[in-house]
Amino acid sequence: MAMIKKLLKSLLRIVILVIMLGFVVGTSCINTIMFHPEFARDGYDEKSPGYVDIGTNGVRIAAVVRGPERGDPPSQELRRGKKAIIRCHGNAEDMMGTLWALEDLAEEGYTVAAVDYPGYGLSDGSPTEEGCYRNVHRLYDWLVETRGFKPEDVIVDGFSIGSGPATELAATKPVGGLILEAPFLSAPRVVTRIRLLPIDPFPNLERIVDVKCPVLIMHGTKDNVIPFSQGKELFELANEPKRFVPVMSNDHNLLPNHYGESRYRELIADFMENGIKEEQK
């Protein structure tokens, strides 16, 4: 009997070690698969318009803040717009590569901000799920604490993999609204609905239910990277008020172009000012 107990304890230790090893290996592998900062090369530097380092304790977190006048040099005081929007960029791009869709809003009096995830652009570190959350939270805190925005005047917009940190921020911090463009249910579920790993990075399907602000979701009807059905399912899980905008597009990266750039900016600006109107639900 004692021998059996000893054997069971040994087997239990082996199982625990295998699980721990699988977690470590799985995390490392999925980080390598998920993040591709090597393709994010928009060539900005510290002298680029609106660049600011919002890092603490000697760790650089590269951010860009434009507005309300586009192209304000960083040497001038960053003017406070009537509302701010945080753009959480996609995978194979950095923060400067994602601003093209929104930066004209700065001319209308809004503050447009973005941050690079760890390992992207000029941000220090290596990309991880938690690192993405941390940098986006830091930009939010910086806008509220340093620039004086009210939390309800900060909108967060996440594109593609950026839907993960955007949804996490909206689920854990008070914000004025959440915009998701071509979002996924979770990162691994883009490839398979079956959970193959002990981790499920960027679990939007679990977090969206905790979002209490207005939600706007856009998705290409024939998206060639993230299935349209995932954006639709995420919309069904979201709380009211919410709005779903299908876009006749098969290009994952060009939603604003296929929707119409001027229409897109009007849609975003209207959401920032008015949330979801009754007739838009």
Give the residues covered by each predicted segment.
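Alpha/beta-hydrolase fold nucleophile elbow
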Residues: 149-159
